[in-house]
Amino acid sequence: MTQPAFFKRPLPSTLAEIAASTGAQLVDASRGGIRIIGLASLDQAGPMHLAFFDNHKYAGQLAATKAGACLVSPRFEADVPAHVAVLRSKAPFRAFVSIARDFHGDALRPQSWFDNTAVAASAVIHPSAYLEDEVVIDPLAVIGPDVQIGRGSVIGSGAVIGPGVRIGRDCNVGAGTTIQATLIGNNVLIHPGCHIGQDGYGFIFFGSEGHVKVPQTGRVLIQNDVEIGAGTTIDRGSLRDTVIGEGTKIDNQVQIGHNVTIGRRCLLAAQIGLAGSLTIGDNVALGAKVGINNHLHIGDGAQVTAMSGVKDDIPANGRWGGYFAKPTRQWFRELLAVERLVRDGAPDAGSPKAAPKDRVIE
């Protein structure tokens, strides 16, 4: 349920308007004048809220809901209580998201925490920095020499933008973020606490001198429409650039090593670790806590299951998982084989199939 203390309350809409906006069918047209003032889950919704249902696991919540209306697929339509107006949709969650975006556009992109519309008095702006019109700088942010920031961008409180950084238009840099040696496109959303463009992890062993640092003289290039979750770190390249492709969405606490290239429209879930000089194609999806070794290539459209460890190249459209990762069908077959061994015991030598026997494990 939307909390008005943090998000603006939307203007009321009628069910007829919602049906027209989403393409859903209002089953009982006589209910078209019912007003909806907000969105909520089935278990929290009230008579003036819209909910959705597309998973049988929540059938109990649907039966008990007090929602005024519910977006539902045709196969679940008969399960909706009589007091709830039915909006029939082939994709109820997609329709719900569409309405949520209309109702709560302010939640899609963080704005100034202080309702600033310009540069705060306590922000530090180097004289050589260039800010286009309508740039907002929150208190205590620091903008370094020769920085350029495009129109409509918002820099959060305590953020530090290093020398020469370029930030495009309609971007948002969250509070406490640091950015150096980086070029950023338009419509990029960087959540609080990110660190972008710092040294990559590069050392070489020089005998008695120990591990000697390798200069990291590349950049980070972040293309248009990228979103980067809170606490994520992206190292700049050593000789070539670290690149984040257009439309890629990165979750919280992801580590991206130097020289990594990530393609367009990729999805990276939380706590992924990408070693250096890795190349990831377009439309790749990586589950949470995936680790990928350096100098590998992940093909277009590949998917990797959460908590997998990848040490080999993955072909385009590959579905891999496990530790170490392999094609998912092979991984599942091996898991089943291990389960059978644990359950039945290994066959005796020379016997095609030994009878199960009791074992004592100490």
From Swiss-Prot:
Tell me which InterPro entries the record gives.
Answer: Hexapep (IPR001451), Hexapep_transf_CS (IPR018357), LpxD (IPR007691), Trimer_LpxA-like_sf (IPR011004), UDP_GlcNAc_AcTrfase_non-rep (IPR020573)
A Gene Ontology annotation in the biological process aspect, one of them, is: lipid A biosynthetic process
Q: In the Enzyme Commission scheme, what number(s) does this protein have?
A: 2.3.1.191
**Which EC class, in a word?**
transferase
Recorded hits in Pfam families, A to Z, give:
Hexapep (PF00132), Hexapep_2 (PF14602), LpxD (PF04613)
Give the molecular function GO annotations. N-acyltransferase activity
Q: What does this protein do?
A: Catalyzes the N-acylation of UDP-3-O-acylglucosamine using 3-hydroxyacyl-ACP as the acyl donor. Is involved in the biosynthesis of lipid A, a phosphorylated glycolipid that anchors the lipopolysaccharide to the outer membrane of the cell.
**What is the recorded name of this protein?**
UDP-3-O-acylglucosamine N-acyltransferase 1
Q: Which organism is it from?
A: Nitrobacter winogradskyi (strain ATCC 25391 / DSM 10237 / CIP 104748 / NCIMB 11846 / Nb-255)
The gene name on file is lpxD1
